[in-house]
Regions:
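Polar low-complexity intrinsically disordered regions
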Residues: 1-2, 99-100, 160-161
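Short glycine- and acidic-rich boundary segments immediately preceding or forming the N-terminal edge
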Residues: 1-11
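Core catalytic region of metal-dependent phosphoesterases/phosphodiesterases
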Residues: 9-20, 24, 29-141
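His/acidic metal-ligating clusters that form di-metal
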Residues: 103-106, 126, 130-171
Length: 171
């Protein structure tokens, strides 16, 4: 399987007939109400059948920053409580996702991360993807806020016939 990023909003995935994918969105991974046990169960089921993982957007909730009007200290996981909230969230996410990094192909942006980027001049999705790739050697791509995932499916039994599927993603 080969993934390529064309610009900020187009990701191409060359795969084979029969390849499987787990498509996720709005994980809000750092929120206390994120059911990580259920998420882990779904991820491990996907990995057991050889599926790759794509995350559409809002990977993080990340709404508890200093300048967020929606912030509530009750909505911070204990491991993220500290003066370096953003760093704690990203570092803990990288640690949790490291064992799945080779199965993760793509992480898109959402309104939560983009709001933080505007207020704090920090791109937490990019930071997460870059740090995960650095620590694990994976090749996870980050996408735009909305865009296209283009699947090109080769069919070995038919030798030259390929199918192309274009999937729009947005929040």
């Amino acid at each position: 399987m080969e993934t390529t990023k064309y610009g900020r909003n187009i990701v191409s995935i060359k795969c084979t007939d029969g390849d499987q994918f787990l498509l996720l969105s709005d994980l809000h991974f750092d929120h206390p109400k994120c059911r990580r046990d259920l998420l882990q169960e779904h991820i491990e089921k996907a990995i057991n059948v050889g599926a790759k993982i794509l995350i559409n957007g809002d990977f993080f909730c990340i709404m508890q920053g200093k300048y967020d009007k929606r912030a509530s200290k009750d909505d911070i996981r204990p491991e993220h409580q500290g003066g370096n909230y953003f760093d704690l969230v990203v570092n803990e996410a990288v640690e949790w996702w490291a064992k799945y990094a080779d199965h993760l192909l793509f992480v898109g942006y959402g309104n939560h991360g983009t709001a933080v980027s505007k207020r704090h001049e920090i791109d937490l999705t990019e930071r997460f993807v870059s740090l995960l790739n650095y620590k694990t050697g994976a090749k996870v791509l980050n996408g735009g806020y909305a865009g296209w995932i283009v699947f090109t499916v080769s069919r070995p039994r038919w030798s030259v016939i390929n199918s192309r599927w274009k999937v729009a993603y947005a929040l």
